[in-house]
Amino acid sequence: MVDIYYSRDGANSFFVINEKREAVLIDPSFSEHRGLFDHINKLNVKIVAILITHGHWDHIASLEEICHLYPEAHVYISDDEAEFLTNVDLNLSKAANEEGYGVNILTYLPIHLLKVNDRDIIEEAGFKFKVILTPFHTKGSACFYLENEKALFSGDTLFFSTVGRSDLPTGTVKTMESSLKKLKELPVGLKVYPGHGACTNLDREKKYNTYLKNI
C-alpha cells in the first residue's frame, strides 16, 4: 500500500508499506510541529529505506532525524545529486532559513548512503523500484517506478498538469524534453505521486499536460 503525508510547507512524503509494516519512505519532507514523525507513529511502521527524488531542502529536511531513529535504513539518491545533501546552497536550505524556516540539514553523509543511476533497481521491503533519471529540475533528479504497484513517484519532475521548474541551481531546460519522454514511454495505468500537490495518473498527463502532450 502507498500512504501519503502532506507537509504543511506543501511537500509530499510517501510510504510504501508491506505486510510486515516495513516501509520505504520517499522524500522525508519538512516536519513542522513533528507532523511527519507523528504520522510515522500512527502508521506503526519501521522505516527500512529512504528514497530521495532530489536534494532540495523541502524533500530532505527530516532526513537527519530519520537516520537517527532508523540507523540501519538505506538511503538512496542519484550519484549526481548526492552532494546536495550537505550543500546548503544547492539544497536551498540557506535561503529557506533566511526566510525563517529553521531547517536542519545534514552536515555529514548517511552511513548507509547508496548512490544510484538510471535504470538501477532498488529492492527493499519486498518491493522493486526502478530508477529513472530525469535531470532538469536539478542535475540529478530521479523518479522511482514501482511496476507491481503501478506507481510512479515523480518528485519535482512531473505534477498535475505541469512540470517542475528548471531555473534553480543545476537546473536546465535543455534536458527537460528527454527526461519527460522517459516518463511518457511508461505503461498506461500508472498513478503518479508528485513531490507537491495532488496525485494524478500518467494517462491523464499524457492527454492534458502540455509538456508531455507536445513531446
List each model region and its residues.
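Active-site HxH/HxHxD metal-binding segment of metal-dependent hydrolases
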Residues: F30-R34, D38-I121, K207-N214
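Conserved beta-strand hairpin/beta-sheet module of binuclear metal-dependent hydrolase folds
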Residues: M1-L43, C143-G155
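Metallo-beta-lactamase
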Residues: S31, L92, K128-I215
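Short acidic-hydrophobic surface loop/beta-edge motif
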Residues: Y5, V16, D118-G126
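Short catalytic-loop micro-motif centered on adjacent basic/acidic residues
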Residues: A23-D27, A49-L51, V131
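Small/polar loops that bind or transfer phosphate-bearing groups
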Residues: L25-P28, I77, G126, P194
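Glycine-rich phosphate-binding loop signature in dinucleotide/nucleotide-binding domains
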Residues: I40-K46, I122-F127, L146-N148, L186
